[in-house]
């Protein structure tokens, strides 16, 4: 493979210049829904005689650009759809190789910035104060500030953020104090420092009426006060997960590991913003059963945040390794059979995704080609679960979990603070297992890495915990009408929450069931009363796919009350595919679109073919 090119950004490539540091001074204005401020970028030339450079921007208003106290010329290029507009800056004097320059750019964000969601007080739990959060992954940092918006560039950052004094600002950095705003007594300035170099997709900001509880020696959980106790209980295992992760990955270099529980419109399960993981409130099940998402985000502190994919084509390097670590953490906590149970559940998710895309779809390849493709549109479970399956398969080929964890720790050590490609990973795998090259050569690398569809080999899974889920799902799938009275509530008595969820996942793979079956399932198991978001999601999909009209309002409610795309997109798709709810689904989307997260609104619109 030739040297990879990042096709998602418009900025000068890393062979021309590299951003080393950002100092951000900005003010958050809820009335105009804008961040206004100055981004001071320390940029190092990578070549001699550098006279100009290009940064990524998206829907930004640029007021001026200053170098050494002097305004300099700049030009904003044409908007290129999802990529935004290139911004070319002329340097007053040519730079030689390794010379640095500080470029101060005065900017303002758009109220429609794809990186930011501005919530009205009514959209928060407290109903009193507005709320702002950012989501920069994959290529939305450019919609917050001008930058080299590529994961191949890593920088440190410091920030000073002015907000209304009744609110709290947090960033993906260590908190560095707060002071009254000297320019406005009704405002406060919060300061931050991120000393570890990070790709700019990990720059994050939240502003809201936030409170915190200490849940570990290096962990506070933050949320609005209405959720803070519940969150502290739900995520109490965080420190034990961190300790296991350090044992598997090496020292935790980030200092603090805080958690932030966001309002329901947050589009992902979690986002691994350093020092401050963002998570969806749909994890608040009340029984810690969805804490694997925390294990996942913790694992990113090594795979993703220390060792980073060089371009989004290689996103599986971030996610496959992180799922692999996540499942080892859960295995240490709950047993090896539990690790296999989740691994097999993940294979099922991969099957579903490939079925949805179609088995020849290019997005089902592990290494994708994102030339002229918005990474948000390509996003799916493939990099997570196909990536995990490859690593799990290699674990089984190369001598088991301990052997492969040895490789993983060495891999993190070798590539920490770097951005790498699949070839870098593969070359290191071969050098680490140099005595097992014969085994590695048996792997069909082309099929695994570059071919669409299911992987060429299915790993071996311990079935102990899955068998009961399969058995019960088969009873329902094969039941005739006269068999329905053989089901009762005790069917679930010996199943864990995870197994009930897997039972529904198994039924859903064979859906639709006859409507009478689904009605009987509600009679005996009362799934409508279950609040666990994963179970509720699969149950409502099953109801809609079986054309149960009574479930329509429940499914619409779940699709709009929260905005985690994993739930919202399939629910809207199922509702649109059912003739009795098709029009209502589209009307509901159109009514809620303005209050949805910008990425969610865009993707649901595409799914429903209305935008």
UniProtKB/Swiss-Prot annotation:
Any Gene Ontology CC annotation: cytosol
Enzyme's top EC category: hydrolase
Places the protein is found: Cytoplasm
Molecular function terms, GO-annotated: aminopeptidase activity; epoxide hydrolase activity; leukotriene-A4 hydrolase activity; metallopeptidase activity; zinc ion binding
Keywords, in A-Z order: Acetylation, Cytoplasm, Hydrolase, Leukotriene biosynthesis, Metal-binding, Metalloprotease, Phosphoprotein, Protease, Zinc
CDD domains tied to this protein: M1_LTA4H (cd09599)
Binding site for Zn(2+): 296, 300, 319
Site entry (Essential for epoxide hydrolase activity, but not for aminopeptidase activity), positions: 376
Family annotation (SUPFAM superfamilies): ARM repeat, Leukotriene A4 hydrolase N-terminal domain, Metalloproteases ('zincins'), catalytic domain
Family (UniProt): Belongs to the peptidase M1 family.
Name of the protein in question: Leukotriene A-4 hydrolase
């Amino acid at each position: 493979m030739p040297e990879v090119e990042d096709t998602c950004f418009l900025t000068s490539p890393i062979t021309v210049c590299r951003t080393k540091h950002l100092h951000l001074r900005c003010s958050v204005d809820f009335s105009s829904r804008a961040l206004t401020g100055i981004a001071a970028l320390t940029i190092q030339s990578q070549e001699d005689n550098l006279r100009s450079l290009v940064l990524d921007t998206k829907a930004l208003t640029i007021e001026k650009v200053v170098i050494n106290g002097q305004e300099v010329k700049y030009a904003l290029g044409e908007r290129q759809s999802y990529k935004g507009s290139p911004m070319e800056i002329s340097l007053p004097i040519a730079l030689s190789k390794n010379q640095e320059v500080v470029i101060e750019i005065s900017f303002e964000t758009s109220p429609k910035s794809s990186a930011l969601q501005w919530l009205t007080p009514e959209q928060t739990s407290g109903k009193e104060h507005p709320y702002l959060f950012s989501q920069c992954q994959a290529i939305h940092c450019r919609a917050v500030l001008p930058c080299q918006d590529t994961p191949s560039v890593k920088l440190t950052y410091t920030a000073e953020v002015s907000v209304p004094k009744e609110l709290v600002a947090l960033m993906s950095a260590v908190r560095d104090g707060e002071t009254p705003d000297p320019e406005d007594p009704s405002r406060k300035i919060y300061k931050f420092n991120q000393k570890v170099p990070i790709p700019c997709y990990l720059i994050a900001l939240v502003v809201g009426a936030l409170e915190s509880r200490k849940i570990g020696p290096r962990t506070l959980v933050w949320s609005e006060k209405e959720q803070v106790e519940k969150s502290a209980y739900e995520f109490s295992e965080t420190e034990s997960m961190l300790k296991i992760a350090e044992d598997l990955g090496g020292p935790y270099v980030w200092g603090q590991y805080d958690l932030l529980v966001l309002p329901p419109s947050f589009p992902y399960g979690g986002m691994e913003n350093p020092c401050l993981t963002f998570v969806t409130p749909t994890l608040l099940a009340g029984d810690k059963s969805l804490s694997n998402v925390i294990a996942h985000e913790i694992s990113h502190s090594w795979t993703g945040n220390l060792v980073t994919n060089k371009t989004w084509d290689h996103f599986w390097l971030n996610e496959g390794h992180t799922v692999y670590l996540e499942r080892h953490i859960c295995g240490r906590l709950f047993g090896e059979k539990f690790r296999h149970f989740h691994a097999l559940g993940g294979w099922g998710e991969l099957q579903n995704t490939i079925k949805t895309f179609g088995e020849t779809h290019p997005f089902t390849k592990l290494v994708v080609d994102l030339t002229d493709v918005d990474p948000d549109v390509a996003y799916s479970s493939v990099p997570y679960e196909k990536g995990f399956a490859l690593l799990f398969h290699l674990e089984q080929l190369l001598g088991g979990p301990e052997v492969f964890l040895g490789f993983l720790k060495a891999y993190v050590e070798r590539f920490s603070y770097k951005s790498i490609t699949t070839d870098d990973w593969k070359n290191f795998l071969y050098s680490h297992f140099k005595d097992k090259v014969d085994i590695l050569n048996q792997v069909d690398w082309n099929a695994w890495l570059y071919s669409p569809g299911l992987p060429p080999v299915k790993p071996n899974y311990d079935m102990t915990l899955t068998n009961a889920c399969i058995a019960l799902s088969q009873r329902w799938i094969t039941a005739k009408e006269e068999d329905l009275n053989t089901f009762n509530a005790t069917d679930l008595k010996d199943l864990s929450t995870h197994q009930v969820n897997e039972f529904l996942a198994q039924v859903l793979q064979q859906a639709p069931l006859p409507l009478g079956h689904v009605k009987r399932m509600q009679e005996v198991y009362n799934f409508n009363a279950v609040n666990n978001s994963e179970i509720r999601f699969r149950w409502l999909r099953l109801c809609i796919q079986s054309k149960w009209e009574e479930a329509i309002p429940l499914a619409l409610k779940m699709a709009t009350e929260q905005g985690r795309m994993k739930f919202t997109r399939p629910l809207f798709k199922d509702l649109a595919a059912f003739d009795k709810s098709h029009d209502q689904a589209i009307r509901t989307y159109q009514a809620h679109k303005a209050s949805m997260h910008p990425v969610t609104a865009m993707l649901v619109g595409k799914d429903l073919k209305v935008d």
